[in-house]
Amino acid sequence: MKICGIDEAGRGCLAGDLCIAGVVLDKEIDGLKDSKKISEKKRVVLFNEICKNAKFKIVTFTSQDVDRIGLSECLKNGLLEILNYFGDEFEYIYDGNTNFKVQKIKTMIKADALIKEVSAASILAKATRDENLKVADKKYPEYGFLKHKGYATKAHIEAILKYGYTNFHRLTYEVKALKNVSKNKF
């Protein structure tokens, strides 16, 4: 049975989209590995190669989606959408340790480094999210989204303290250093 690899990007971020990708490879692609271990330039090259040589589905949830229905529900809905897109003919492997009660999905810790289809999904999810962050960085350059990628770095927290939140931020995420910052958007 062919494998459909699934991974996500943007799970633990304060800002930006949550992107979930599912990939079924039609042919071998050299250089597939965990997207975090690949340069952005190489990720873009692999993204294009995967899109040409694989069946794939990318599901994106905005910060507002994550705030409205919650991270776990977004992840569950994304997994279900990928499962519905590909159907019953594949074995589904998701990077991590929980399948969010989606029974047909098997989980595997470090699958993004071990299973080429999951590596490909990792690359699609990360490259898609990075494109979203370019939009955020153009609109709000003072936040430095391209440097911290939406994570809770010191520079990102300082930017929120100075400028407040934007529509790219997840307002339901609690960070001690931001406890007294107004949730009104920039």
Which residue ranges define each predicted feature?
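RNase H-like, Mg2+-dependent phosphodiesterase core
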Residues: 1-186
